A protein has these predicted regions:
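N-terminal secretory signal peptides that target proteins for export/translocation
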Residues: 1-13
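Compositionally biased, disordered extreme N-termini, encompassing classical targeting presequences
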Residues: 11, 17, 33-36
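Basic side chains
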Residues: 14-15, 87
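Extracytoplasmic entry segments of secretory-pathway proteins
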Residues: 2-5, 30-35
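Short, solvent-exposed linear motifs at loop/edge-of-secondary-structure regions
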Residues: 5, 18, 22, 83-84, ...
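Charged, low-complexity intrinsically disordered segments
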Residues: 33-170
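Bacterial N-terminal signal peptides
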Residues: 16-30
Length: 170
């Protein structure tokens, strides 16, 4: 039984359609994701790049949490911004500000041709493009030799993106 079921003391029972449906739904949510959204929304956040403002990396030079008050849906996903000005900049040029590889970890795309979550504080802008990673330590390595890693990530991304589309995330 997965931790979420144990946490809530849920035990599947026979003969209960509601119990069976509830248990199945909860168990499915406990299975590690084999597929991921094309835009990284975190594990349960439902907001692009864990609610961080993609424009702030460029204009403020730092990671900033966005606000639901300043949100915009792009690629079927809500994006949060720290201000209405940042939201308007993003609306005008989303591909300029959106992170590469759907906001997933650049290293995971490069080394494993897969997606994992990120630490929004682990970031770099290289040649005018935003890259995110799972840790600040990895990002330090990435900044030391970006061309090697980007070549691998660029080679792997089309297959990763295709897999995401095949899994029904567009």
């Amino acid at each position: 039984m997965c931790e979420a079921l144990q946490k809530y003391g849920v035990t599947p029972t026979r003969g209960s359609a509601f119990g069976a449906t509830f248990s199945i739904a909860l168990m499915v949510s406990c299975v590690p994701a084999l597929a991921a959204d094309q835009v990284n929304t975190g594990y349960f956040g439902g907001v692009a790049i864990m609610g961080y403002d993609p424009v702030a990396y460029f204009t403020e030079g730092r990671a900033m949490k966005g606000s639901e008050e300043f949100s915009y849906d792009w690629l079927g996903t809500p994006w949060h911004f720290a201000s209405s000005k940042h939201r308007e900049l993003f609306i005008a040029e989303p591909t300029k500000y959106a992170p590469q590889y759907g906001g997933y970890c650049t290293g995971e795309v490069a080394f494993n041709g897969a997606t994992i979550n990120i630490d929004p504080e682990a970031w770099a802008i290289i040649d005018g493009k935003l890259y995110l990673a799972y840790s600040k330590e990895f990002m330090a390595e990435f900044k030391a030799r970006p061309s090697d890693l980007l070549a691998k990530a660029e080679a792997n991304w089309p297959a990763v993106e295709t897999q995401l589309e095949q899994d029904g995330f567009q």
